[in-house]
Each structure stands twice: as C-alpha cells, then as structure tokens.
Amino acid sequence: MVEQVALPSQSAVATAFKTANLADAFSIQLPSDSSINPDVLARFIFSVQPSWIGALTNVRDAIVAGFGLKTAKHLATLSSDATAPRISIFRVFGTSETEVVLGENDKHLDFRVSILCTPGSPPNTGNQLTLSTVVHCHNLLGRTYLSVIAPFHRQVVKASLRRAADVGWPKASA
C-alpha cells in the first residue's frame, strides 16, 4: 500500500534547496526478498510505469515546448551521454548505498527526486522505499507550471509505486 509520508530527514533532498515550493514523499513496503539497491529500484520503477503516464508526458511536452522548457523527448536524447549519468530521463545528482537522487534544472524550476531504502518498522518486516520530490521554482512560470502539474505529479508517483509492486519488485542478488 502506498502511503503519503513526511519527507525523510535523512534524505539528501531534504536539504537540496533553501526554499521549496513543493515537497512530498510517498512510501511503500518492499517484500523481504526484494532488492534494496536504490539504483536498481529507480530503474525498475521508471521502466514499468503505467502507459497513461507516457500519454500524459506527451501532452505536457506539447504544451511546455512552446515556453522553451525541457521536454521528456529532449531529455531522453541525453541518456547516451556517459559524462552525465541518467536514470530514465532524469539526471543522477547523487548516489549512496541507500539512496539515489535524480532531477533536472530548468529556467522555470529545479527539482530533485529521491528513491530511498530504509529498514522497515517493526524490524524484519521488509524495507521501506520512499520516493520523495522537492521542487524549487525560479519565477512566475515555474510557480504557475507547478500549480497545474502538482495534482498530476502526486497521482503519477502513487501509480508508479503501485504498478511496480503489482509487477513485482526486482529480487535481491544472491
């Protein structure tokens, strides 16, 4: 079950920006035999998203291209650049044993997405995966964009986590 939770204080995105126009986090319990590698989990989540998310992204791209903002199609072309690692369309800003931080900087806003794995509570109940997003807007365009996109963003995150659970999380390496 996907639950909205507080932004984890141990996450690198908690201090990514001096101010945030959006900060949210959603958590799901992982099965005890699943991978806890945040890179593996991030790649998996983005590879099995529901098809309607791709359609929604295409609509978004058609609208924002007219404002000179980065499109998913453009970001996908950057995936082959070995000097700037990416997961799906997102630039990798940092990795650790428990977390991968993704995001993008654009003229209207900057954002960071964290995939963080932490021990479950109570112990021996599997690990928790928390997907957090923090957004810092630069201007009116960013704030307007965020006000329109925020409700969709929350649905996309929840649906992505649910879909990953339905498909079945990648197993831990033996």
Residue ranges of model-derived segments:
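Active-site donor-binding segments of glycosyltransferases and PAPS-dependent sulfotransferases
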Residues: 70-76
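Hydrophobic-ligand binding "helix-grip"
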Residues: 79-123
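A conserved amphipathic terminal alpha-helix motif
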Residues: 145-174
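Beta-strand residues in well-ordered beta-sheet regions across diverse protein folds
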Residues: 29, 103, 130-132
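Amphipathic, low-complexity, repeat-rich surface-exposed segments
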Residues: 1-2, 139
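Short beta-strand micro-motifs in enzyme catalytic cores
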Residues: 24-26, 100, 127
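Hydrophobic ligand-binding cavity/cleft-lining segments
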Residues: 2-70
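Beta-strand/loop substructures that line and gate deep hydrophobic ligand-binding cavities in soluble
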Residues: 107-147
